Amino acid sequence: MSFTVAVKEEILGQHHLSWHELSAIIKMSGNIGLSTSGLTLSVVTENAKLARHLYESFLHFYEIKSEIRHHQRSNLRKNRVYTVFTDEKVQDLLSDLHLADSFFGLETGIDEAILSDEEAGRAYLCGAFLANGSIRDPESGKYQLEISSVYLDHAQGIASLLQQFLLDAKVLERKKGAVTYLQRAEDIMDFLIVIGAMQARDDFERVKILRETRNDLNRANNAETANIARTVSASMKTINNISKIKDIMGLENLPVDLQEVAQLRIQHPDYSIQQLADSLSTPLTKSGVNHRLRKINKIADEL
């Protein structure tokens, strides 16, 4: 099950669709038709539970007994698509939900009454997500929530609702419609709280924390590996120089303070500068050891 499906099923498992949720779903996923008996309404979804909720909502709010039809997509994913269809009281339903103008292109935005009411806005966002929303799986490490709209002004209305909840929503116009999106993990988690998907919010945060912890450990390990590599590289250069001095002039001819450092470096090529300093018969600072190693390298360069 994808993360998007998990979020939608959590929402649908909590309550029946509200008036404003129903309005958003029909506006974003509904299609009006005309038959000999009058107007028809079809609402299309790939979510079987949402189709069932729509059927129950039509019956509960309007005493409309709709049909649930389904077919298989012919694309690669071959998803099953559900259509909730009715030809009963469609005009009454559209009028009651203030959607009549939407389907005839006269009003493509969001009703001002919804934009100005927090609870109505919350419910509308929930319905909009159920209809056309998606969230990238947090396991991917790339956070994105999208709600697609047919009309740009509707997408902008969705953004306004999100911004009322202090979410950094943006709108992108596409060839076919527009999308309202969030990209910050914190905004996506807050959105899940807004629509009441608390379990999904906790799951999202858990995955996010695990990923960040793994990334921090990887960065620390990479830094440590790089430090070790630099230490070994510097150590091998010095060891080669010490071997050169030994072959040409003999280590015994080095100043006494350099002889001990040279011997220790040969015996312990993996030691850090601090470990070399701690191993000397007379304790020395790291800068002191570095100074002596530079002297040894200079002597070798001059041979």
Swiss-Prot record:
It comes from the Bacteria. Belongs to the WhiA family. One of its GO terms (biological process) is regulation of sporulation. This is Probable cell division protein WhiA. The lineage of its organism: Bacteria, Bacillati, Bacillota, Bacilli, Lactobacillales. Involved in cell division and chromosome segregation. InterPro entries: Homing_endonucl, Sporu_reg_WhiA_N_dom, Sporulation_regulator_WhiA, Sporulation_regulator_WhiA_C, WhiA_LAGLIDADG_dom. Residues 272-303 bind DNA. Keywords: Cell cycle, Cell division, DNA-binding. One of its GO terms (molecular function) is DNA binding.
